[in-house]
Amino acid sequence: MLPWTVIGLALSLRLARSGAERGLPASALQGDLLFLLDSSASVSHYEFNRVREFLGRLAALLPVGPGALRASLVHVGSRPHTEFPFGQHSSGSAVQDAIRAAAQRMGDTNTGLALAYAKKQLFAKAAGARPGVPKVLVWVTDGGSSDPVGPPMQELKDLGVTVFIVSTGRGNLLELSAAASAPAEKHLHFVDVDDLHIITQALRGSILDAMWPQQLHASEVTSSGFRLAWPSLLTADSGYYVLELAPSTDPGAARRQQLPGNATGWAWTGLDSDTDYDVALVPESNVRLLRSQHLRVRTLPEETGPELIVVSHTRPRSLRVSWAPALGPDAALGYHVQVGPLRGGAAQSVEVPAGENSTTLQGLAPGTAYLVTVTAAFRSGRERALSAKACTPEGERSRAPRPQPQRTGGREP
């Protein structure tokens, strides 16, 4: 058990230092932190008091405030119980005092029930939770539970909640590793109840790291790619980046790109449409440690159209072409309409802006069969074309002279 504590401590301390190196004050952090405290009868009064003291000291070190980090405490027992909701206390010391005043609830260890309750609290406005901010759960346990923990914990993680677990008992390593967020060496601590102070700074650093604003973001998303951007974290001399991309359903098909330290963006192309991709930006530097950043991006559905070309208003030297516009979220940038004689000859083309789906073609020859092609150009760089045949009518025939009426009753000269 000791190696887990030492490894988690070393890594978390490095990550805690990296947070300060980013240049943003701790007050820039925003997030909702929920402490899940085993308050059941399986925990002795001595152990409960030691854990309560540990959580109080941890809270005192955090940047708690109305516009920063908010904390809440939920007891695990026969039924979950909220000691205080998010936003009730506006400083770390106030949260510490509230934790120290919490009384043990006793009862069964229904952790699964408490986790389902915690999910509602983390996303409920009535509980003081805020939308759009990072969510972190810190669960301190002696390792046992009277009901299943896996399914409700997975639901929390699927919603983006970062889960830290501190086990003070004989918990199952495999089960707790699966319950904590990955990687387990950062999010799971096995430590004796009298040695909890050893991981206080490490856990604080990991919590702040989990609540740091996401800096990697995607833009210009199309059906076949997207562009990534991030702030300058390194220089050309201080390190480099490794950018990783993989379909979320097939991590083995990962693509990697190494970029110089002064890079702040990259465009992925040639991707599958309507697909989730997991992206990781890994800064590599011997000067300072920076955590990797992760993002999931979904490409747009494949473009469709143009469709159903309609030829109308045919004249000997002109005709009108209409078409069903291209559909899909990746709208067409415009259309290229080309017309040329089927039996050979010079073709002409017309550019039609996006938002229009018809044009009149002029300067054609009477009585001629033409091939009309409408091509839609998309932001992704792809093009889709559709063709149809059209014929111009013959030109008007010359009229025959109108017959003159014959004279009657006269002489020929």
Swiss-Prot record:
It comes from the Eukaryota. This is von Willebrand factor A domain-containing protein 1. The gene is VWA1. Residues 212-302, 305-395 form the Fibronectin type-III domain. Keywords: Basement membrane, Disulfide bond, Extracellular matrix, Glycoprotein, Phosphoprotein, Repeat, Secreted, Signal. GO terms for biological process: translation. Residues 1-20 form the signal peptide. Glycans are attached at N262. Gene3D superfamilies: Immunoglobulins, von Willebrand factor, type A domain. The modification Phosphoserine is found at S72, S78, S91. Its main location: secreted. Homodimer or homomultimer; disulfide-linked. Interacts with HSPG2. Pfam families: fn3, VWA. It comes from Bos taurus (Bovine). InterPro entries: ECM_Assembly_Org, FN3_dom, FN3_sf, Ig-like_fold, Ribosomal_bS16_CS, VWF_A, vWFA_dom_sf.
